[in-house]
Amino acid sequence: MSQFNPMGGQSTTIQSSLVPIVVEQTARGERSYDIYSRLLKERVIFLVGQVEDHMANLVVAQLLFLEAENPDKDIHLYINSPGGSVTAGMSIYDTMQFIKPDVSTMCIGQACSMGSFLLSAGATGKRFCLPNARTMIHQPSGGAQGQASDIHIHAQEILKIRARLNEIMAKHTGKSVEEVARDTERDNFMSAEESKAYGLVDDVLYQRVPEESK
């Protein structure tokens, strides 16, 4: 497997020395992986921390890599994020929709702002939340300074982005655009069950469902 660091989305405060190493026995001897690289072999991707360009590029790279490995097998995206950059998040969103495999999403901890947006963008019927996880939706925010005309241009751009995000959120949740616009006017926090009722996820998982014996 290609060697790149899937920990790119993790907080920089986490020291690499704290990441567990998994050792496997193979026909060629022992092989060691950090735990996240080992989980990538199982088609598990972690989106953890702020959504920003570096983390988004790594998530996109992993999505494309797993599609190339097997275009017919699901990818599992675990999300624990307070949100972040809209453009970085949209690069992940567009890739999720572009690739052939279904992307199953799972909220662990929290999925706020762009995190909740990506959570809702998983394949229909394959969007999940753990029971004590929290989500939050709201409108995009930004700031500008300079000439009045430039500030006006930036304000208009934020409004266009907000309208587009509302359209996409409405598509994935089954809500109307008007409902989404109203519900994202301010920070709107939801429990796991409330997230399910709103349509951000399809189910709340209290324990792993055992696989059927073959």
From Swiss-Prot:
Designated gene of the protein: clpP
Main location class: cytoplasm
Keywords noted in UniProt: Cytoplasm, Hydrolase, Protease, Serine protease
Residues of the active site: 113 (nucleophile), 138
Lineage: Bacteria, Pseudomonadati, Pseudomonadota, Gammaproteobacteria, Cellvibrionales
GO molecular function: ATP-dependent peptidase activity; ATPase binding; serine-type endopeptidase activity
Classification via PANTHER family: ATP-DEPENDENT CLP PROTEASE PROTEOLYTIC SUBUNIT
EC number(s) from the headed UniProt entry: 3.4.21.92
InterPro entries: ClpP, ClpP/crotonase-like_dom_sf, ClpP/TepA, ClpP_His_AS, ClpP_Ser_AS
Self-association state and partner proteins as the record states: Fourteen ClpP subunits assemble into 2 heptameric rings which stack back to back to give a disk-like structure with a central cavity, resembling the structure of eukaryotic proteasomes.
Function: Cleaves peptides in various proteins in a process that requires ATP hydrolysis. Has a chymotrypsin-like activity. Plays a major role in the degradation of misfolded proteins.
Subcellular location: Cytoplasm
Catalytic activity: Hydrolysis of proteins to small peptides in the presence of ATP and magnesium. alpha-casein is the usual test substrate. In the absence of ATP, only oligopeptides shorter than five residues are hydrolyzed (such as succinyl-Leu-Tyr-|-NHMec, and Leu-Tyr-Leu-|-Tyr-Trp, in which cleavage of the -Tyr-|-Leu- and -Tyr-|-Trp bonds also occurs)
Biological process per Gene Ontology, one example term: protein quality control for misfolded or incompletely synthesized proteins
Protein name (database record): ATP-dependent Clp protease proteolytic subunit
Similarity comment: Belongs to the peptidase S14 family.
Annotated Gene Ontology cellular component terms: cytoplasm; endopeptidase Clp complex
